[in-house]
């Protein structure tokens, strides 16, 4: 016999009228699908329905912001030739990862409003978690690629810029990087995807108390969070060191020549534009750090710490913060990247980004950084 609850939502009120008190999480999950819900969650009462409605509203707003922001990034890149530089391909790739994160949001909205459990059971849970896995891991390693690109561009302006072929190879590498820890739980090769928190989201299993789960969580933490984070910190540290060394070299050379500065206004504007773009990349990385660190902490506590500290609410908040970054990324880029900002303002004046000619000119000069700043470096 077909279980009709697989296809039709359970009225939300039923969860709150079934007994005098609130029932436990998993009350509306049939026995054949109960494996989706770890026993840890089944010890908590279902959250008040207003928590579900509130989360649905928050996710709907995030979905709208992400759709508009990432849509603008992809549209401007596709229709503006001057924007289509190798470096900006990394930003477009980041937008694509953010779009994958966007695709799972409608599932959570529907689940929160009508089901209060995983939509589509195992299949729906796998789709939701796989989208989140690719988006999260991909964003992390793509931020590392952006940091590498900024380091090469600013520290080696003559021959350090990545070619289009090199950028495409790195972008392909970011997608390949997402596969191991997405496919292994998806195909049940190692670990699996399960419901978590309010049972309206899914992720890899970090609660099963065995050695296999602990090793998996430790490996995915290193692969998707710690290693990209180390790369990013390394590249930005070296970038800052290179900029300081370059400025020191110019000051020393100017002192020897008894002049105030070796840089012309054009040189200064070109270098300033590249540094502004580096600041944008650093801001996006900081947002990634703030968004994904809480979730990384939850997973590590679940595998190695005191699981009693993990309540449904305490795990749903990090799940929300992990989605926020996909909404903010494009707006940070649109507001802070000079040429992109000018192009958006030209086409969408109602956004009132306030881009002036000076900023646009400054970024235009950045396309010649390898010539201007490079000449200064060569003169030393």
Curated annotation (Swiss-Prot):
Question: What are its GO cellular component terms?
Answer: membrane
> Where is composition skewed (Low complexity) in this entry?
362-372
Region Disordered: start-end pairs: 358-380
CDD domains, alphabetized: 7tmA_photoreceptors_insect
| Sequence ranges on the Cytoplasmic membrane side | 77-88, 149-166, 244-279, 337-380
Q: Which residues carry this modification: N6-(retinylidene)lysine?
A: 323
Glycan attachment positions: 3
Task: Give the GO biological process terms.
Answer: phototransduction; visual perception
User: Record keywords: Nucleus included?
Assistant: no
List cystine links.
125-202
Give the SUPFAM superfamilies listed for this entry. Answer: Family A G protein-coupled receptor-like
Task: Give the subcellular location.
Answer: Membrane
* Spans traversing the lipid bilayer: 52-76, 89-115, 129-148, 167-191, 216-243, 280-303, 312-336
Q: How is it modified after translation?
A: Phosphorylated on some or all of the serine and threonine residues present in the C-terminal region.
Keywords attached to this entry: Chromophore, Disulfide bond, G-protein coupled receptor, Glycoprotein, Membrane, Phosphoprotein, Photoreceptor protein, Receptor, Retinal protein, Sensory transduction, Transducer, Transmembrane, Transmembrane helix, Vision
- Known role: Visual pigments are the light-absorbing molecules that mediate vision. They consist of an apoprotein, opsin, covalently linked to cis-retinal.
* Family the entry assigns: Belongs to the G-protein coupled receptor 1 family. Opsin subfamily.
* Protein name (database record): Opsin-2
The UniProt gene name for this protein comes to Lo2
């Amino acid at each position: 016999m077909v279980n009709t609850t697989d296809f039709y939502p359970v009225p939300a009120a039923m969860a709150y009228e079934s007994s005098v008190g609130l029932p436990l999480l998993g009350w509306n999950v049939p026995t054949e699908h109960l494996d989706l819900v770890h026993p840890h969650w089944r010890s908590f009462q279902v959250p008040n329905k207003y928590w579900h409605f509130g989360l649905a509203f928050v996710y709907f707003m995030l979905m709208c912001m992400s759709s508009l922001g990432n849509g603008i990034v992809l549209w401007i890149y596709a229709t503006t030739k001057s924007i289509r530089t190798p470096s900006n391909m990394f930003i477009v790739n980041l937008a694509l990862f953010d779009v994958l994160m966007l695709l799972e949001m409608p599932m959570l909205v529907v689940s929160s409003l009508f089901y209060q459990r995983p939509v589509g059971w195992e299949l729906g849970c796998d789709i939701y978690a796989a989208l989140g896995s690719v988006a999260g891991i991909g964003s992390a390693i793509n931020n590392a690629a952006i940091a590498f690109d900024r380091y090469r561009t600013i520290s080696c302006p003559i021959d350090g810029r990545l070619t289009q072929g090199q950028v495409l190879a790195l972008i392909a590498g970011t997608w390949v990087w997402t596969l191991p820890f997405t496919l292994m739980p998806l195909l049940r090769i190692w670990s699996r995807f399960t419901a978590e928190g309010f049972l309206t989201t899914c992720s890899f299993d970090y609660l099963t108390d065995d050695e296999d789960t602990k090793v998996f969580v430790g490996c995915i933490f290193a692969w998707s969070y710690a290693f990209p984070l180390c790369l990013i910190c390394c590249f930005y540290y070296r970038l800052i060191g290179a900029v300081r060394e370059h400025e020191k070299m110019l000051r020393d050379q100017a002192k020897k020549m008894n002049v105030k500065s070796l840089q012309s206004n054009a040189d200064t504007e070109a270098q300033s534009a590249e540094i502004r773009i580096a600041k944008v990349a650093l801001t996006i990385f900081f947002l990634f750090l703030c968004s994904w660190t809480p979730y990384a902490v939850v997973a590590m506590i679940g595998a190695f710490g005191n699981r009693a500290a993990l309540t449904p609410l305490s795990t749903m908040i990090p799940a929300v913060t992990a989605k926020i970054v996909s909404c903010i990324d494009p707006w940070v880029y649109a507001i802070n990247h000079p040429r992109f900002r000018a192009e958006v303002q030209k086409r969408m004046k109602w956004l009132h980004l306030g881009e002036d000619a000076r900023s646009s000119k400054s970024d235009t000069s950045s396309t010649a950084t390898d010539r201007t700043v490079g000449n200064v470096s060569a003169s030393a």
